[in-house]
Design a protein with these regions (language model features):
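Terminal, non-globular segments
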Residues: 1-167
Length: 167
């Protein structure tokens, strides 16, 4: 195994444990839930294939689903986000960037990185909450949960980016 693969596995284990033990238990005001494992998917290098990204997304989702006793909704949402990530990232990159760059403030600048992250995270929550609520009569709850969870998760993304050594 290469050093990058070992680092990915280490990051996967640490984020999965943090998600399951801490963040899945926190529901601010009964609406907002942070899914910090999305940071891992956001920070995968651009050259990571779409299939690899989707496998990582599915693995994070299934670990969260098993720990939280949810029937596959995190898996579906994380896989949907992983599928669309490539296309969203392509909209914010230019030809001068190397193929193996890691999305972040250094490569995309603050504006590009924030929009990229918000769009990816919005796809995750726009898939997750309709599957969880499964009823249109809860539209207001769906909207509040989606917006508040995107905001809370973005807060963690920005804080992580501030403390990232690769800034």
């Amino acid at each position: 195994m290469t050093g990058k693969t070992i680092a990915h596995i280490r990051n996967f284990v640490l984020l999965a444990l943090a998600q399951v033990i801490i963040f899945s238990q926190i529901h601010l005001f009964g609406y907002a839930t942070a899914c910090i494992f999305l940071i891992f998917l956001l920070k995968l290098p651009r050259h990571t294939t779409q299939n690899e990204t989707m496998i990582w997304g599915f693995l994070f989702g299934i670990v969260t689903d098993i720990a939280c006793n949810t029937p596959g909704i995190h898996s579906a949402a994380a896989t949907a986000m992983a599928f669309t990530r490539k296309y969203i990232l392509a909209a914010f990159t230019h030809k001068g960037l190397p193929d193996d760059f890691i999305p972040g403030v250094k490569s995309l600048k603050w504006g590009g990185y924030i929009v990229y992250a918000v769009l990816c995270i919005a796809i995750f929550y726009a898939t997750l909450f309709p599957l969880e609520l499964f009823a249109i009569r809860h539209f207001t709850t769906l909207l509040i949960s989606t917006i508040s969870s995107i905001t809370l998760t973005m807060l963690f993304v920005v804080v992580t980016e501030f403390f990232s050594p690769n800034k």
